[in-house]
Amino acid sequence: MIINAKGPASFAEKYIVRSIWENKFPPGSILPAERELSELIGVTRTTLREVLQRLARDGWLKIQHGKPTRVNNFWETSGLNILETIADLNPEGFPVLVDQLLSARTNVSAIYFRGALRNNPDTAMEVLAQIHQLEDTAESFAEYDYLLHHTLAFSSGNPLYVLILNGFKGLYSRVGRYYFSSSEARQLALNFYKELELLAKAKNYLDVPALMRTYGINSGKMWLQLRDDMPSSIAQQDSH
């Protein structure tokens, strides 16, 4: 098992998570005893204990006082915070994960975009006005796109959408920089922003879902053209 890590705790965490992912520690199984596991990984028991607590908080493990540590089925017990980890563990499946991420984001954003234009059209107009000074670079578009989503999610009347977006943030920012490196993708997005601005000015929230659906289809087609050339390094958490 080849693991790139910045220190003993990082190594131990990646070792255990990869072992769970590769079914060496399958869901429902009991982890080896602390002393045995610390010797196996090559870290102190204190370091291991801290790592186990962190993995339990993320849903990978179940720790109960006086009982052995049990491996969870992370698909049932973890949240969006493990998206980065899954991308790291499964680079071959990363393009599919991104497809699923973008699909989920498109579906959810249709709800909070509509909510924002309905409940806070002035805030929507304010953030959309920034498109007229937007630099034609991948970095600027990726940053603005996240800002737009974050602002409208917060203005939708349901701030829980912001927490969902936060779970996507690291992964989406890397994918976004790659996606918006295409001038066609930037133009497609700019046209969408302009149409959304017109709806905001007209306080027309009813037509938002149709606009989102059209942009979702068109940007999805654009993504399919780009994804096969996506650098594998984008899957890595430290990629910039």
UniProtKB/Swiss-Prot annotation:
Annotated ranges, domain HTH gntR-type? 6-74
Q: Which GO terms describe its biological process?
A: fatty acid metabolic process; regulation of fatty acid metabolic process
Checking InterPro entries in the record gives: FA-response_TF_FadR, FadR_C, TF_FadR/GntR_C, Tscrpt_reg_HTH_GntR, WH-like_DNA-bd_sf, WH_DNA-bd_sf
Gene3D superfamilies according to UniProt: GntR ligand-binding domain-like, Winged helix-like DNA-binding domain superfamily/Winged helix DNA-binding domain
Which positions does the record tag as DNA-binding? 34-53
Compartments reported by the entry:
Cytoplasm
Query: Keywords assigned by UniProt?
Result: Activator, Cytoplasm, DNA-binding, Fatty acid metabolism, Lipid metabolism, Repressor, Transcription, Transcription regulation
**Its domain of life?**
Bacteria
One Pfam family name is FadR_C
Q: Which GO molecular function annotation, any one, does this entry have?
A: DNA-binding transcription factor activity
Q: Provide the transmembrane region boundaries.
A: none
List the protein's name. Fatty acid metabolism regulator protein
Please tell me the species this chain comes from: Shewanella oneidensis (strain ATCC 700550 / JCM 31522 / CIP 106686 / LMG 19005 / NCIMB 14063 / MR-1)
Query: Source organism lineage?
Result: Bacteria, Pseudomonadati, Pseudomonadota, Gammaproteobacteria, Alteromonadales
Gene name, Swiss-Prot/TrEMBL: fadR
